[in-house]
């Protein structure tokens, strides 16, 4: 400032009088002088002003940048002791974020010597429930491998915390399912956190937990969206707001928001701002170009417009505001405020942590994502309606014997359920279904001529539907009347040891495990694109894909979920996969030179997807197997894929991957095509485990729609708002499936 010398002399006098040292610092607002213009823009955005009327709220010059040590010594040459004191002060500032010591909650290991002992005990108990006739060798090997890695990394308390939350939800009859990379874990499956059977899937545990990364695992659990709040309240009751809080998320400027805010600062009209921003998308600064402005009718040579475009490009990626994460909970052993910065949430008695998930990952702080999913609410309603109006659909021939077992007071929490005991008594070895549990009995009866099924259904489809005599009367929405008890099937985790018998009886509700697996009629329905309301495959794009892909197995649904995404489409993966699936194109797997590996190394990675990389795990395996990446480097590639739109660092792996594949004998053009496909994932690529978790819900919702379209329509209507379709479209679809939908009637209708 012009009066800097006078101010310095005055401050020196005050310091001498108070006998405290003088410290020299700069008023740093940006790192380099050329950023002064962007600082002015940010100031105007904060103050809701334009540059023309901001006045003295803006800095007078560009001196608020980070100056070098030599420049600071020159500016404070009249007070060298202030420079020396600044250095002395900095030398004493020894705090590092590495000193923050996060400790997992430990109270859930009561009764066990260590958290690892508790984890193994709970997982082994779950394995016995999942595999009542013996744990398969493949699963046993996976469990032992995961136990060892979890123990070495000290993550057992994290798994126990998630297990405790999921166990609470199931005890309350709340449908829940883990997804994401956690579905790679056999331990999570046995704990009941995820539903992807490791015996049937070839999943990569290191995608979830890796010794090279040494980062805490991140488990996402979906709960019924209408009852997620019950789970959140349980977390706060158990740990208190002093130990539990929601993580933050940093909202950054994208192309549209940057153009809008900078345009307002420069006084552009709303029409001009709308025209410039309306056709922008994503994070790319390159999209805000002179060519773009010219296409929408502006003159890029206009000085004001050129300045707007340049500053908008600089603003992209800057933090805009701090928001609350959709469901990421941080839970600690000690107090939150001793570990992380916190603030009050909008809701009373709740806390928000002022760090986002990337900050938490860097510091290895536990985060559990407690998410809401509308389809789980719909499926819960569907199962309740089936239990109430179609009890025979899941009835077992041994129903009476099960009831006698119940009356005998069998402790279902002690291990085996009554249905398992009776199956063992009859020595009928059951086949495990896609959900890893005992399949439900076959549906009884036939279907008479007045079938609710569409006329194009095949006879074998009709034969498995319940007969009209077995169906209860149902009119428009959820009907009244007393609910019937389930026929011997129970949620394997619905009770706690201290629950009363009455509470246990209230919790006898059907869960997704009773849905029969791999019914051809369900796949035929999906192949006709008859998927209105079905989870994940109800969009127009999915309906277009279904008749082309024609799913026939559960893994086909995994492919269906993953392939209709911007990543595979942009990476030119969809059409090659379809052509190969239909036999129109030969599947060819290039081989490395004999000195560098077996000829079928890529077939082992891409065989299931016909040579097309559709999943993040496959991209990681290609990098490791074909390009010589270390596992840690492959994980960095995954992270670059996940943040491609925002950060754009995937380009740094191009040369390493292409050169690595070429050095091992792969054709360079093939290596370039592989990289382009991987780059096409952007942040839209699915991990296979995530797609498998969603495919389970696809099949469950499709089965209910196929067999009981009235139940499915009622559940969808009572779960609104959710999905792609309005209630009128859901009603019309039900009518097209032969369902009579009546008007609201005070004698029959009920509320939910």
Name each model feature, range by range.
Residues 37-113, 117:
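Active-site or pore-adjacent capping/gating segments
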Residues 407, 422, 427, 450-451, ...:
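Cationic, low-complexity basic patches in intrinsically disordered or flexible, solvent-exposed regions
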Residues 1-33, 74-77, 96, 121, ...:
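Domain-core and long-helix interface of multi-subunit machines
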């Amino acid at each position: 400032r012009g009066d800097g010398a006078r101010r310095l002399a005055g401050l020196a006098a005050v310091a001498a009088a108070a006998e405290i040292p003088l410290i020299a610092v700069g008023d740093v607002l940006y790192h380099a002088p050329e950023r002064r213009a962007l600082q002015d823009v940010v100031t105007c955005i904060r103050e809701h002003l334009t540059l023309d009327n901001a006045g003295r709220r803006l800095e007078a010059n560009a001196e608020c940048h980070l100056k070098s040590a030599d420049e600071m010594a020159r500016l404070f040459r009249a007070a060298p002791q202030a420079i020396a004191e600044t250095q002395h002060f900095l030398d004493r500032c020894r705090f590092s974020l590495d000193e923050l010591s996060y400790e997992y909650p430990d109270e859930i290991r009561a009764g066990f010597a260590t958290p690892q002992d508790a984890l193994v005990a709970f997982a082994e108990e779950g394995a016995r429930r999942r595999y009542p006739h013996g744990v398969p060798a493949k699963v046993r090997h996976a469990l032992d491998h995961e136990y060892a890695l979890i123990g070495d990394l000290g993550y057992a308390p994290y798994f126990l915390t998630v297990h405790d939350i999921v166990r609470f939800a199931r005890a309350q009859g709340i449908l829940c399912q883990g997804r994401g990379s956690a579905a790679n874990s056999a331990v999570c499956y046995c704990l009941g956190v995820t539903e992807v059977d490791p015996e049937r899937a070839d999943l990569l545990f290191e995608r979830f937990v890796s010794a090279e990364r040494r980062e805490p695992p991140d488990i996402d659990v979906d709960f019924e969206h209408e009852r997620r709040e019950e789970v959140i309240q349980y977390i706060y009751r158990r740990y208190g707001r002093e130990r539990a809080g929601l993580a933050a998320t940093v909202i950054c400027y994208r192309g549209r928001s940057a153009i809008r805010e900078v345009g307002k600062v420069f006084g552009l009209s709303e029409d001009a701002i709308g025209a410039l921003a309306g056709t922008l998308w994503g994070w790319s600064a390159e999209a805000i170009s002179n060519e773009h402005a010219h296409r929408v009718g502006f003159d890029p040579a206009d000085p004001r417009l050129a300045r707007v475009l340049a500053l908008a490009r600089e603003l992209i990626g800057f933090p805009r505001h701090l928001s609350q994460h959709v469901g990421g909970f941080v839970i600690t052993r000690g107090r939150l405020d001793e570990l992380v910065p916190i603030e009050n949430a909008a809701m009373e008695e709740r806390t928000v942590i002022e760090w986002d998930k990337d900050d938490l990952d860097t510091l290895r702080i536990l985060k559990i994502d407690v998410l809401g999913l509308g389809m789980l609410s719909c499926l819960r309603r569907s199962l309740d309606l089936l239990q109430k109006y179609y009890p025979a659909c899941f009835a077992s021939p041994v129903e009476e014997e099960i009831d006698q077992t119940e009356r005998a007071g069998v402790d279902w929490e002690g291990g085996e359920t009554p249905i398992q005991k009776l199956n063992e008594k009859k020595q009928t070895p059951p086949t495990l279904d896609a959900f890893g549990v005992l399949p439900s009995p076959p549906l009884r009866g036939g279907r008479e001529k007045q079938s609710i099924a569409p006329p194009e259904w095949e006879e074998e489809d009709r034969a498995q539907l319940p007969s009209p005599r077995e169906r209860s009367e149902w009119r428009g929405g959820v009907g009244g009347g007393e609910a019937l008890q389930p026929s011997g099937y129970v949620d394997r985790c619905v009770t706690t040891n201290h629950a009363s018998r009455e509470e246990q009886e209230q919790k006898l509700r059907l869960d997704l495990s009773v849905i029969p697996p791999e019914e051809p009629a369900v796949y035929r329905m999906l192949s006709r694109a008859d998927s209105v309301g079905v989870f994940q495959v109800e969009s127009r794009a999915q309906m277009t894909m279904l008749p082309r892909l024609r799913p026939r197995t559960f893994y086909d649904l995994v492919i269906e979920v993953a392939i209709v995404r911007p990543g595979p489409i942009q990476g030119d993966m969809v059409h090659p996969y379809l052509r190969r699936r239909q036999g129109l194109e030969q599947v060819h797997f290039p081989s490395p030179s004999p000195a560098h590996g077996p000829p079928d190394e890529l077939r082992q990675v891409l065989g299931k997807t016909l040579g097309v990389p559709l999943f993040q795990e496959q991209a990681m395996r290609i990098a490791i197997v074909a390009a010589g990446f270390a596992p840690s480097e492959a994980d960095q590639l995954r992270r670059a894929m996940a943040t491609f739109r925002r950060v754009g660092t995937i380009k740094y792996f191009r040369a390493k991957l292409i050169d690595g594949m070429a050095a091992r004998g792969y054709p360079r053009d093939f290596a370039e095509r592989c990289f382009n496909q991987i780059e096409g994932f952007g942040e839209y690529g699915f991990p296979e485990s995530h797609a498998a978790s969603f495919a389970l819900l696809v099949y469950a919702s499709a089965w209910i729609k196929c067999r009981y379209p009235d139940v499915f329509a009622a559940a969808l209507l009572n779960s609104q708002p959710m999905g792609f379709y309005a209630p009128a479209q859901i009603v019309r679809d039900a009518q097209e499936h032969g369902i009579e939908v009546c008007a609201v009637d005070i004698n029959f209708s009920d509320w939910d």
